[in-house]
């Protein structure tokens, strides 16, 4: 068994080594200066937002395509966002929930962990809103005769109509897959290893419609902007009454989606993957 682990370790980290790597990474993140964490969070938020732009393009005017196939394509292209975050070394709130492994290991304090979560969360929000603003002013919502903007509206509205408990559980499922992807990337020793291993777990959560709080920091504000600031020409092109999307507002965004999804993401990442995986590898 030892020789098998040694052979594996030459091409990839063993589960125990990956857990050590996760703990070291979590410790580094928690000890980073808050301003750097915030700026790194902006970068990650922008990466995820751009990935959702890519996703939206693949879903636009796709009514004639098989539903599952369309979602699969959307999930696969969205994985680019998490790949960019990991390769660039940016900080994403959902994967930063894994800092709980360093807290459980006694290497950081609860204050350090919570501070990192808050700073990165705010940075992610700024990054997502920045891309939303740039996309809006670029006129991208008018692409494909306004169908691109209609996809944004439909996707955003769907997200705010989960029940609170549904959104919470969709958040758990999402961050189980995100943190599985990131944790598996810790085992890779090359950029190709790390990128390739994350594609399918991320594709799974997106194609299945699980909820990611940072992605929603772009998608739902983008929907709100499109619903309330689009020109009459936009609505004429898509042939839809603007009142259909009047419920896209801050209340529905924050209360009905962002809060329960964020809490679910914490449970899915910090506990279901971080603490559980550490227990599996560190206690034997």
Swiss-Prot record:
Signal peptide: none
One Pfam family this sequence matches: Form_Nir_trans
Gene Ontology terms describing biological process: formate transport
Entry membrane topology: Multi-pass membrane protein
PANTHER family per the UniProt record, alphabetical: FORMATE CHANNEL FOCA-RELATED, FORMATE TRANSPORTER-RELATED
Annotated NCBIfam families: fnt, formate_focA
Name the UniProt record assigns to this protein: Formate channel FocA
Source organism per UniProt: Haemophilus influenzae (strain ATCC 51907 / DSM 11121 / KW20 / Rd)
């Amino acid at each position: 068994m030892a020789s098998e682990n040694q052979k594996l370790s030459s091409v990839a980290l063993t589960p125990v080594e990956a857990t050590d790597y996760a703990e070291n990474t979590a410790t580094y993140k928690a000890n980073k200066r808050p301003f750097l964490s915030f700026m790194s969070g902006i970068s990650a938020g922008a990466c995820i937002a751009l990935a959702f732009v890519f996703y939206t393009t693949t879903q636009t005017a796709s009514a004639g395509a098989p539903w599952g196939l369309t979602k699969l394509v959307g999930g696969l292209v969205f994985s680019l966002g998490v790949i960019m975050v990991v390769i660039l070394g940016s900080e994403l709130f959902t994967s930063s929930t894994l800092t709980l492994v360093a807290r459980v290991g006694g290497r950081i304090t609860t204050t350090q962990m919570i501070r990192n979560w808050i700073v990165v969360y705010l940075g992610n929000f700024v990054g997502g809103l920045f891309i939303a603003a740039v996309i809006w002013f670029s006129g991208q919502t008018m692409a494909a005769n306004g169908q691109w903007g209609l996809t944004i509206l439909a996707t955003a509205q769907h997200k705010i109509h989960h029940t609170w408990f549904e959104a919470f559980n969709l958040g758990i499922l999402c961050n189980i897959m995100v943190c599985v992807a990131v944790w598996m990337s810790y085992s890779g020793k090359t950029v190709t290893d790390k990128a390739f291993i994350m594609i399918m777990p991320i594709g799974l959560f997106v194609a299945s419609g699980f909820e990611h709080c940072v992605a929603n920091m772009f998608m739902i504000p983008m929907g709100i902007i499109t619903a309330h600031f689009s020109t009459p020409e936009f609505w004429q092109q898509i042939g839809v009454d603007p009142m259909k999307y009047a419920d896209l507002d801050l209340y529905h965004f924050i209360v009905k989606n962002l809060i329960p999804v964020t809490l679910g993401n914490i449970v899915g990442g910090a506990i279901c993957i971080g603490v559980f995986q550490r227990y599996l590898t560190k206690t034997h």
